[in-house]
Amino acid sequence: MRQYNIPPINRELITPTREKIDHLSKSKESLGYVETLAERIALMQGTLSPHLEHPCHILFSADHGVVADGVSLAPQIITYQQTLNFARGGACASVFAQLYGFDLTIVDAGVVGDLSIEPTIINRKIAEGTRNYRLEPAMTPEQMERCLSVGEEFVASFASQGCNVLSVGEMGIGNTSTSSLWMHYLTGLPLGECVGVGSGLSREGVEHKLEVLSAAIRRFTGTPTPEHLMQEFGGFELVMAVGAMLAAAERRMVVLIDGFVMSAVALMASHINPNFLDYAVFGHKSKESGHARMLAAMGATPLLDLGMHLGEGVGAMMAYPIVQGAVAMLTQMGTFSSDGIIKYFK
């Protein structure tokens, strides 16, 4: 795996950015975390006048071999059907991408079945689903490397079009299981605190899911490095997302993070290069059990808390207007001086 050269944010701008915000024609700190967000984006871009251009939302879809062990309420074919739905415009991610002004890219990373009937779905299929990681590694080292490269390639293309805002979504029945395993290894939290209902499991279903994942942990006896965790337990769509997020941070893009699954991807990215988190904006706190703990482990502040747990990147896109508001505040508001208002605080 290559080294990701993510530039550190420009911390020398902290004081001048705060001074600029405090001279805007509003009471001090009255916009709360929106002001912090504006400061973060200024530091990401290295300027007191940040801008947001050409937001792109990429959806990676793939299947997971561990689904054969009954870790999900939904059948595997839902991955195939919903990926078609993305392309046909009926899915929430499709609707929200149009609503919030994101260019939408849909990628077959490893779905079981032929998706060529929808030409707008880009075929980057590694294989028809991963192997069952309860029994063997989910993918080969070569497949893992290919996934990272594919994610990077899409971001390079987006950047060439002027994109500096990236949102990543996923579709893959069974991928909350991978996310739980990554969370367990990377945070050190007990597996039981990392496993939730996913697509709607009963209490008995969650207990069974925990048993399957515990068996996968017992099988793996290697060192839990990021490379090994991606290879052993990863999904093709999730490893592509890791590559995309890291490549976006290398280009100083604002990276919008969705819920539980994409936060696990962000967690993985942060263990590959800790600078990644300086470019990550967490859209919302998911209803999925464990997400709040994962956010806390990364020191992340989600912008929304609406009880959502859909996936697809919809929570990230819904938070984008808040990001736009933060940038507009910093770059378009008048100052006390320009607006003829007495500045009544220090």
Task: Enumerate the language-model features and the residues they cover.
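N-terminal loops that bind phosphate or other acidic moieties
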Residues: 1-346
